Each structure stands twice: as C-alpha cells, then as structure tokens.
Amino acid sequence: MAPAAASGGSTLPSGFSVFVTFPDLLFIFEFIFGGLVWILIASSLVPMPLVQGWVMFVSVFCFLATTSLMVMYIIGTHGGETSWITLDAAYHCVAALFYLSASVLEALATITMFDGFTYRHYHENIAAVVFAYVATLLYVIHAVFSLIRWKSS
C-alpha cells in the first residue's frame, strides 16, 4: 500500500499489490462468490423468472464491474486520483445494497419452489442463496472499509 500512496498520493493500490492490501483483496472473493451465484442460478430451472432475473442481473453486473475495477486497479488506471476512492466507495455501497436485495429474493424463490423441480435444482438454489449471502457480506465489508478510506482521503 505504501508504494501506491508514495507514487500518486492515492491510498488505492496498483499493480499486484491489489491482491495483498485490505479491503482490495476482497475483489478476489467477490469475483469467486459472485460468479458462483450466477452460474448456479443459470444452471437451475428458474422457478420465478421475474425474481431470479433481478438476481441474475445483480450477480452478472457486480461480477463484471468487480472484474473491471480489479483490472483497472492492477494496470493503475486510477493514476493516484482521489475521485477513484469515491468511485470505489460508491460502487461497493451500491453493490452491497443490490446484493442484499438479490439474496433476499433468491431465498424467497428457493423457499417457494413447488413441485416439478428436482432436488438437484432445489439444492443448486440453496447453494446460490448461501453464496449470495456470502457475496453480500463481502461487499458490505468492502463498502465499510472503502468508506473509511474515502473519509480519510
């Protein structure tokens, strides 16, 4: 974290220090658990398309946005600008709220699964709920520490 701060005045890491600084190392876990959520939902029969459509939107959007941010941090796109700290905090707050709503809706869709769905699809949806709540927790933690970083910048 010190090299990024020394080079441009930013507390955002660049290069591979993204993978060793907190809270930015959470990108890896957000990427993994977010990807698992949309893969599990896509592979199951969708019992409530409208509800799970929102869950798919949130998980794919956050997966792509997290991947984009992580790549931009690695290549140093932020260039030491403090506006990137604001962007980071805002994104993670929005992602945490979106994922919380998606987690609750996925739990609702799983609870209300009716006859005609196999146990395999039911278990895939249960796993998607668990991973969605893990992703929510990761985004909340990242949002809190990004807000702390934003306030101190």
From Swiss-Prot:
Domain MARVEL: 18-151
Gene: Mal
Cytoplasmic side: 1-24, 76-92, 148-153
Subunit-level organization: Interacts with PLP1.
Regulation: induction: Up-regulated during myelination.
Modification note: Lipoprotein.
Topology with respect to the bilayer: Multi-pass membrane protein
Family statement: Belongs to the MAL family.
Protein name per Swiss-Prot or TrEMBL: Myelin and lymphocyte protein
A Gene Ontology cellular-component term: plasma membrane raft
Function, in words: May be involved in vesicular trafficking from the Golgi apparatus to the cell membrane. Plays a role in the maintenance of the myelin sheath, and in axon-glia and glia-glia interactions.
